[in-house]
Every structure is written in C-alpha cells, then in structure tokens.
From Swiss-Prot:
Biased composition (Basic and acidic residues): 243-253
Family listed: Belongs to the RimP family.
This protein's encoding gene: rimP
Protein name, per record: Ribosome maturation factor RimP
A cellular-component GO term for this protein: cytosol
Function text: Required for maturation of 30S ribosomal subunits.
Listed Gene3D superfamilies: RimP-like superfamily, N-terminal
CDD domains xref list: YlxS_C
Annotated compartments: Cytoplasm
Gene Ontology biological-process entries: ribosomal small subunit assembly; translation
Keyword entries, A-Z: Cytoplasm, Ribosome biogenesis
C-alpha cells in the first residue's frame, strides 16, 4: 500500500508550539510521539490516556492545514507502534488509537484560533478571567497573546467582547454547528483530492469529456455565415458604349442594332 504523502509544510507550521501540555503519562507519550509525527509531516494535537475498559491511548494528529485522512491515521499508527513499544512509556498493556481532531476539535495552537474565527467556541480557563472560568461565544480571532470572543449571554451593561489570555486557557473546543460541518467536509474533500493528485491516483475524465485546448480561443463560436446576396455586375464603360450614349442623346439610332 502506498503511504500518503502530505504536502511539504513550512517548518514553522510543524514546529508551532501547543498552548496546552498534558501531564503525567500523557506527557511521556507526547515526548515519544511528537518527533515521529513531525518527521512524517503531521502535527500532534492532543494525547488522552483513558482507563475505561482497559487502557486506551488516543493520539490526535493533523496535517498543518487541519485535515487528517484515514490513510494518514493508518500510516501514523504503523510508524508510532514500534517506537512506542521500544520506549515503553507505560507499565501496562494499552490500546493505541490514532485519530483526527474531529469536527468539534480542540484548539491547541495560536493558528487554530485564527483559522476558525467566525465559528462558535467554548473555552474553559485554567486561571479565571474576570471572575469566570467558562466562556462560550463566537470566536473573533486573536489579538496579541489573547483570544477574542464575542461572549453569549452578555447583559446590556456588559461588553460582549472579551480578550482571554492564551496562556491561561485550560481547554478550548469548537461547538458543532451546520456551518462548521460544511466547512469540515469541504476541507476533507479538498485534502482527499490533493492526496490522490500527489499519488498519481486522480481519476481520468470520462470518455465523453473533452479536454480544453489552451491554444484555442474560448470565445463563443459564431453561427453559420449568411449567404451573400447576388451582386450586380459592375457597369462597363468601353468606347462603344460611350458612342452609343452620344447617339442616344442626339436622338440618332444605330441601324446596325436591333432586328
């Protein structure tokens, strides 16, 4: 099976630090997984270790453009499994899951808050801001080291716009809406087309589809030319014609003409 080949991203895109760092066991998995993912052209989003029904280690990853296809997850899993087996960051058996961040994804980098401006977000502060720990509203981008949010439920006496310091954010996540679903589907389809194109798997156009020739003009074709009306023969002006005209003016008749 051919490995997916993400578009080569800028180094700064891959190296952009996360705002949220996991503690404990998750931090040990992060130290092993992040360099491997980065070498493959992916970014680590979040690692979650769950003890429900056995131990599950969920690693969220993405391309720098925010997408992550099934083929990407499979490739990352094959690369990470042997490395984690050697590093042995946990002293018990666990099940490894590699996934995309999902539609209602966590926002873990500064670029995430800029990319998803205009969408609904919910934020929980690690350090209370203006006496509040939870905020929900429309994401309005970033300003300096703060996140701009048009807060829901603000009273007439309150300014709905709040600036939340990034370093004080404990958890930030998009809220599922129709607009967010539509944008996520659009991003996913574009990423799939790009992947197929990079692997040379783009389907050929159907036989009846005509390829456009860039050398030819794309101006609308003109209809059939109308038939030209018959033209009268050009009048002749020989010496014989001039003599006949003079006789006609003088009232003379040429006896050589006619019956």
């Amino acid at each position: 099976m051919t490995e997916p080949t993400p578009a080569v991203p800028e180094t700064d895109d891959l190296a952009e630090p996360r705002l949220v760092i996991e503690p404990g066991v998750a931090a040990r998995f992060c130290a092993v997984a992040e360099p491997v993912l980065m070498a493959m052209g992916y970014r680590l989003v979040r690692i979650k270790v769950s003890g429900d029904a056995g131990c599950t280690v969920q690693i969220m990853a993405e391309r720098p453009d925010g997408t992550m296809l099934i083929d990407d997850c499979e490739a990352a899993s094959r690369a990470l499994s042997p490395v984690l087996d050697v590093a042995d960051p946990i002293d018990r058996a666990y099940r490894l899951e590699i996934s995309s961040p999902g539609i209602d994804r966590p926002l873990v980098r500064r670029s995430d808050f800029a990319r998803y401006a205009g969408h609904l977000v919910k934020i929980e502060m690690a350090v209370p801001h203006q006496g509040r720990k939870r905020y929900r509203g429309l994401l309005d981008g970033v300003e300096g080291d703060a996140v701009r949010v048009q807060r829901e439920g603000a009273t007439k006496d309150e300014d709905p716009l709040v600036l939340l310091p990034m370093h004080d954010i404990g958890d930030a996540r998009l809220v599922l809406t129709d607009e967010l679903i539509a944008e996520s589907m659009r991003r996913g389809k574009q990423a799939e087309r790009d992947l197929k194109q990079s692997l040379g798997l783009a389907p050929e156009p159907p036989p009846h589809a005509k390829r456009s020739d860039p050398k030819k003009s794309h101006a609308p074709k003109r209809g059939p030319k109308a038939a030209k009306a018959p033209t009268k023969p050009k009048p002749q002006n020989t010496k014989q014609h001039r003599l006949a005209a003079d006789k006609a003016r003088r009232g003379e008749i040429d006896t050589s003409e006619g019956d």
